[in-house]
Amino acid sequence: MERIKELRNLMSQSRTREILTKTTVDHMAIIKKYTSGRQEKNPSLRMKWMMAMKYPITADKRITEMVPERNEQGQTLWSKMSDAGSDRVMVSPLAVTWWNRNGPVTSTVHYPKVYKTYFDKVERLKHGTFGPVHFRNQVKIRRRVDINPGHADLSAKEAQDVIMEVVFPNEVGARILTSESQLTITKEKKEELQDCKISPLMVAYMLERELVRKTRFLPVAGGTSSVYIEVLHLTQGTCWEQMYTPGGEVRNDDVDQSLIIAARNIVRRAAVSADPLASLLEMCHSTLIGGTRMVDILRQNPTEEQAVDICKAAMGLRISSSFSFGGFTFKRTSGSSIKREEEVLTGNLQTLKIRVHEGYEEFTMVGKRATAILRKATRRLVQLIVSGRDEQSIAEAIIVAMVFSQEDCMIKAVRGDLNFVNRANQRLNPMHQLLRHFQKDAKVLFQNWGIEHIDNVMGMVGVLPDMTPSTEMSMRGIRVSKMGVDEYSSTERVVVSIDRFLRVRDQRGNVLLSPEEVSETQGTERLTITYSSSMMWEINGPESVLVNTYQWIIRNWETVKIQWSQNPTMLYNKMEFEPFQSLVPKAIRGQYSGFVRTLFQQMRDVLGTFDTTQIIKLLPFAAAPPKQSRMQFSSLTVNVRGSGMRILVRGNSPVFNYNKTTKRLTILGKDAGTLIEDPDESTSGVESAVLRGFLILGKEDRRYGPALSINELSNLAKGEKANVLIGQGDVVLVMKRKRDSSILTDSQTATKRIRMAIN
């Protein structure tokens, strides 16, 4: 108070006012504060002060030739004084107005191309719809989000090379454009920006926006795809939200969404195959997403999702060090534990062997619709603070945390036996058994957990076993909070290992991910996903399996035919026949297989019985492990279109129909391709026609390598010997004649010699 009086007193003297307003500031500390460094210390003041001057702008000397000294109103546009410390002229803001109205107009053709991201944004906003504003508490959590829609997914280094090549093609420096996307973009941009007058630096900045994903760690309550993030400031405040539907999709969001769907489908499918890891890699390498190889997208795309991370781990890429359980991402924020095997008894007296985490640890749990902070000790939940969109989401988080805590009362709450299996019909591990059990029904778990009195803490309420909020009581250690828990912000990636059952571990051996963690949610991909692998044939149902299996045989008929005669077991074990087995009734698979294999053996043994269509038709049935029986079949059943349909062993059926005249094969009425039979299979004079120009030397001789198909014979040099597969599926040794003159006699001798060679 005294000081204020003193100051008032001082100010009343006119001299004080004069000193404060007129004299220069000469205190070194103040001068230092405002003049050190390039950073402007008070930008808004500086701007106001500058604009109050007559000539606040400096411009290149050429301006004096292009802009008149005075405008129509007679106001001076530039000063004859040159700027101190540079050879530029001092210019009035009025000169800018004059230039905008009367200055030269250049071609605008390049603007939409260079500023593409801005033009696209305007279009999206124009077609977007803004709904009503709602006032309510916003539970925002910080998530790592993509902030520039419409970008390619190049790494910073790749983008830098592209930009240098497009904008500064003549600059020195090694630039290696290797990836498909780099080359395409460079070619496209060079064409678009020919004769572009916009400053190269600006073009470079804009290109960077188009090529590289930029992420920020922002508080978000709603959608996280980039077209929502660009309007974040319009759609959510501290206590309000505005509904918004974007006016267009962008490719980067589509890629992220389709990648997740493809990865989930692939992991689910691989998990049920004989060798999950090998199958997963085979599928990732043969899948295209929107025309781009899935493995290329995986290398560049930072999306973190359980299935995507399993695929990345399989490819040897680094992934985030957080782990997944029950659909929540767990990140340990403090503490440590050691793991020990322990046997526990459920409420049903079933013994479970669980890996117990001994020690005090704290975790953040982040899910799609709920987040939490979990503090736990050895087999004891100390505290869980959870927040979520609704009661259901909060309950999900509580169940996961209770199971994760490994508390005894949770294990004792199990009623009935635990025998959940995964898609491959293998028992789940004990922790996932418990999780599935309580996800189905958590009533007993919540009832047995225990209740406690609670203190009144700002922003926190208790929650009772029936999920109703309360300010007096709560389930032991559990509170519901208004504030969300931020996602783990670090973008650090760690080296991981993956076993053949797709369990991903960090270098300490902790399991980070497993197929059980992959969401079962089905979605429709926004970009076309092309799975070339036979394992994914079943994704479109039984009919697709049937058609694809036969198409595969027809496409590879030349090599299939050779294997059929030489190495049938290897052929029967081909993975392309695996999906087909699911169509054959389980009880009879083995008998069918035994029957077809016997039939094929007779074809190999008996001259003149080789039948292309019949082999193609029956081959998929021979792939199942055969049962020896004397059973004969005139038709084989496949389960398609919701019922059993028959394939006739001899003759056509709606399922498998071969038209001899058109040589077309139709499966279930769908065209499956052209089938070229061996020339005139009905007569046994086949070979003579085919083997003109070759001398038949006798039976197959393994020293001359695997049997060639008839088409491959033409590559032999004169005098060269080879084994060849002839019409009936028999193999003989031939030599290409040294002289052409004797070709005619071949036809007559061939038939005799073949009979001798085979018998």
Curated annotation (Swiss-Prot):
Note the superkingdom of the native organism. Answer: Viruses
Name listed for the protein in its UniProt record = Polymerase basic protein 2
Gene Ontology CC: host cell mitochondrion; host cell nucleus; virion component
Protein's job: Plays an essential role in transcription initiation and cap-stealing mechanism, in which cellular capped pre-mRNAs are used to generate primers for viral transcription. Recognizes and binds the 7-methylguanosine-containing cap of the target pre-RNA which is subsequently cleaved after 10-13 nucleotides by the viral protein PA. Plays a role in the initiation of the viral genome replication and modulates the activity of the ribonucleoprotein (RNP) complex.
Q: How does it assemble?
A: Influenza RNA polymerase is composed of three subunits: PB1, PB2 and PA. Interacts (via N-terminus) with PB1 (via C-terminus). Interacts with nucleoprotein NP (via N-terminus). Interacts (via N-terminus) with host MAVS (via N-terminus); this interaction inhibits host innate immune response.
Cystine connections: none
Q: Where is this motif: Nuclear localization signal?
A: 736-739
What Pfam families does this protein map onto?
Flu_PB2_1st, Flu_PB2_2nd, Flu_PB2_3rd, Flu_PB2_4th, Flu_PB2_5th, Flu_PB2_6th, Flu_PB2_7th
Q: Which UniProt keywords apply?
A: Cap snatching, Eukaryotic host gene expression shutoff by virus, Eukaryotic host transcription shutoff by virus, Host gene expression shutoff by virus, Host mitochondrion, Host nucleus, Host-virus interaction, Inhibition of host innate immune response by virus, Inhibition of host MAVS by virus, Inhibition of host RLR pathway by virus, Inhibition of host RNA polymerase II by virus, mRNA capping, mRNA processing, Viral immunoevasion, Viral transcription, Virion
Per the record, where is site Mammalian adaptation? 627
Task: Write down the species.
Answer: Influenza A virus (strain A/Udorn/307/1972 H3N2)
List the molecular function annotations (GO) for this entry. Answer: RNA binding; RNA-directed RNA polymerase activity
InterPro entries, sorted: Flu_PB2_2nd (IPR049110), Flu_PB2_6th (IPR049114), Flu_PB2_C (IPR049115), Flu_PB2_CAP-bd (IPR048298), Flu_PB2_middle (IPR049111), Flu_PB2_N (IPR049106), INV_PB2 (IPR001591), PB2_helical (IPR049113)
